[in-house]
Design a protein with these regions (language model features):
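Amphipathic alpha-helical polymerization modules
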Residues: 1-167, 171-176, 181-304
Length: 304
């Protein structure tokens, strides 16, 4: 009887975790570049039940069968499907469009490929590279940038956007002190490079290097850890997962004057949330049933 109680309780915890994930998805429908989460559940290992027969000196096990002891919410995976683009005409709004292919691998609609051996391979994803207040690199698809008091391109959280030289992008280029260029008036090309708005020529920094955004390719995006508002980080041991994209091709491009909308489907999210709530209520009723059964066993069976 207790096994059934534990199974129902585990189901309640799993559905609560799923409900929390869906609620977070719905709350971020209007967050640019947000990628919806998916609570992955898996069953506990099966138990082989047997009954011992015979004397204490020579017990013989008679198999009854297998029983599953419930499910658990194992992890929360992000679904990195490309979001729709929304035009804003704001020059500091940038959207990443990526469809990175890996030779010899055909990803499914969710960006996943399962090898014949059962190994899961996920489609690499492209991200803007930003620097937090502690100088640590972070990754984001939220391209709704602004300019801070120091003339730097920053995220809504105040994180500085990095260029390919690994330094924050400053919107005033003083390569020629006699004729400084205001990068706020520049255009940003599909490869993330800053171009002169008049002649379309690349703009260079004080060292003569072309000014371009640092776009990183994360080989396994499911190694990323959410920090909120579409910002992710990698653990130190996973730092090698992120590599700069120095020569962008048609698989990755930057669109100026657009933002990438969240890829959350509000209709499907409401359906999933309702289903999770119903499953939670069902497990709750089973817990109440087992509770009443045990109460009867304790208080009434002994009277017989």
């Amino acid at each position: 009887m207790l096994r059934g109680l534990y199974t129902a309780a585990a189901g309640m915890i799993s559905q609560q975790r799923k409900h929390d994930t869906i609620t977070n998805n719905i709350a971020n429908i209007n967050t640019p570049g947000f990628k919806q989460g998916n609570a992955v559940s898996r069953s506990f290992p099966e138990m082989l039940l047997a009954i011992s027969t015979g004397g204490s000196d020579s017990p013989v096990a008679s198999a009854i069968g297998r029983i599953n002891t419930g499910v658990m919410a194992e992890e929360d995976l992000s679904i990195y499907l490309q979001g729709d683009l929304q035009e804003t005409k704001n020059p500091f709004d940038l959207a990443l469009v990526s469809n990175i292919q890996v030779p010899g691998i055909a990803f499914d609609g969710a960006g996943k490929y399962i090898t014949p051996e059962g190994e899961r391979i996920y489609r690499p994803q492209a991200f803007f590279t930003v620097q937090d207040v502690n100088g640590e690199n972070r990754f984001s698809r939220n391209g709704r940038f602004t300019v801070n008091a120091g003339g730097e391109l920053v995220t809504p959280e105040g994180y500085r956007v990095l260029g390919q030289d690994g330094q924050p992008v400053v919107l005033v280029d003083n390569a020629d002190p006699a004729n400084p260029v205001l990068l706020a008036d520049a255009t940003i090309g599909p490869q993330g490079q800053f171009l002169d708005a008049v002649n379309g020529q690349p703009l260079n920094d004080v060292n003569g290097n072309q000014i371009s955004l640092l776009i990183s390719r994360v080989e396994n995006p499911n190694r990323l850890i959410r920090e909120g508002n579409g910002v992710y980080r990698l653990n130190e041991e996973d730092a090698a997962q992120a590599v700069p994209i120095l020569n962008m091709n048609d698989q990755v491009r930057v669109e100026q004057g657009y933002i990438e909308r969240s890829n959350v489907d509000p209709t499907q999210s409401m359906i999933d949330m309702t289903a999770a709530l119903r499953a939670y209520e069902t497990n709750q009723k089973m817990v109440q049933f087992y509770d009443k059964s045990m109460e009867k066993a304790v208080n009434e069976v002994g009277r017989v």
